[in-house]
Amino acid sequence: MKGEANMSENYNDKNIKKILESENVPQELKPESIKIMLDKFSGERKIKINFKRTAMRVIPIAAAFAVTVSAAFGYMLKYNHDGDKCLVSESSLNDADSVDSMKYAADYSEVYNYFKLAEKKASRIKSNGYDEVMADGVIAEDSVEYSVQEEEVNQNSVNVSSQQKKAYSDTYNQETGVLEADIVKTDGNNIYYACGNVINAANVKDGKFLNTIQFHKDEEAINDMYLYNNILIVISSANNFSENVNYGEENDCCGLIYNDTCISFYTSGEYPQLIGTYTQEGSYNDVRLTDNGYLYLVSNTEKYYSSKDFTSEEFEKYIPRYSVNQEVKYVEPDCIMIPEYCPDVLYSSSAFANISAFNLNAETPYEPTDIQSVAGFSGTVYCSYENLYLTFGYEDTEITRFSINSGKITPQASGKVKGYVNDQFSMSEYNGYLRIATTVNMRNNSWNGVFGDSQDYNNYLYVLDMELREAGKIKDFGLDETIKSVNFQGDTAYIVTFRQTDPLYAIDLSDPHNPVIMDEFKINGYSSYMQKWSDNLLLGFGQSADNDGTLTGVKLTMFDNTDPENLSALDTVEINADYEHEYVSSEAVWERKAMLIDPEKNIIGFPVTEDSYYSSENKNESYYIFYSYKDGHFNYLNKIQNDMEYDAFNRAIIIGDYVYMLSGLQFKSADMATLSNVESVEF
């Protein structure tokens, strides 16, 4: 229901004026300082947009730098034991400002007043001369797949028990009981593979393709899928352009990009049928599904309207929207959290992180059981069985913990740590603590640091309690290097950093208040992903490099962690370029789900692309390659070629005694015993 304003317009204006007049513009944000830096560094820089997992911002570049590293989630709350009011949660950074408390809005007008105040703060800065040096641009902040553990489980547990009960592989789950989405799913009889805006499906048996269809075929690009309780859940993104609107100042107009995250619910089987749809405003961030059937979806919303263009009664212009079977609704005010005080950031738009929950066991699984919208953005998402963590930031990372229980989302605590997280595997909840590894750019206050030209890095591993207060930390490892991958196994963390070599650190976390480095093992190249192979073996996959740190191809390494104080590499396999004009790459370097890892069946597979550039001709070879591991050595099994132009396998799954390689244009099957081709089908 639309709310009425609690205060008159004149009263608000007086308060806004009082706040604005009391603030000073920082020296580094004065127009002359920004102009010097932009003249030096911005030039013709291209700005990349990743529509899959981004917190998207269409704002002037100079203002973007001030906003991007701000504490977007520094305003989270924790409840007191009575649950009656919000309390400020102490920051994990000893030298950081305390985190402002948040509250649920009483009505929509309170949300309107908050963003109007933020807009006027931004307008004040612009009127002081910033418009002379601002250039319109787009910044897309990566939320790299972008964190995970259980008691002696987590991403490190092999998750064999559930797979032993079925004769087909599934997406590797980093946290036991928390299921991961992917672009391929199977029920053992049918394969569903998402490519662009289409789902390629095949009914299979014993390596044969009995029937194939294509469905979905909407305008939205498919991001992820789940297969649960005979329901196929398809998550996709729709990117749209709005009409020109005023942006803050009179006659200052722009066309805006806005995104929706869509979920389509289908029956599973050979011929899926649509049973319902849900649309949530905002760009898709991430999703999780607990094994009891509750799905949690995260998106980021940002609207760009000047408050001059609408009144508080026009709530549809600033309140997050969602729809069930195309029936449009708006998030209720008592589900919208805003800071009690306007933050010192340059918000000139209404930005929210939206979290929705669904019960997939219900008769209408497309009806949300809960929706929470929080002022700010979300980046990397990590989920344990009982808690969902949202992070955001670069110079500092803001962390917010939400409890999740049977489709109910409840904000609990927030905190802050130095640096940025590499991906979701950089975090682990274990025995009442959250462990989080970060990289700090020690020159990130300089413009060299902003543009990524600095090599001055430090790395931290924090241990936080459930109120996200610091219990312990260790730092100063991997100096001048950045974290590439993290693997937590119980009380031990394994962290890979890289600049020239690949140090693998083993860190003892048995005393949460006093983490200790047990060993540092160096090897050329780096592992971008690590997964437990067995109790004493750690599998690493990443990029190979020479002694100077120049990347040469991809590699597979088996580490012996029997004694964490004496790490070693038992075997390494590299696929490198042979000539100067060759390039070897693998999607698995940045997307670990492209790998097939099955310790029970003793098989490891990943896609490889080899490009050759010569004066006479260019050559491209794409294949999926397989290895086994036995007695301290990798053994080459075979590689399945993809002979179609401009196509590459990027997934493989096992059903029974057969493995299926998948791409956007074709499926291929092979006998597990010999890994020889059985059949292929094109789409």
What are these regions (language model features)?
Residues 34, 56-57, 61, 82, ...:
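General helical structural elements
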Residues 48-76:
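Internal signal-anchor transmembrane helix that establishes type II topology
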Residues 1-51:
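Disordered, charged N-terminal biogenesis/targeting segments of membrane/secreted proteins
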Residues 3, 60-64, 69, 133, ...:
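N-terminal cationic amphipathic segment used for targeting or macromolecule association
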Residues 78, 82-683:
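Beta-sheet-rich non-transmembrane sensory/scaffold domains
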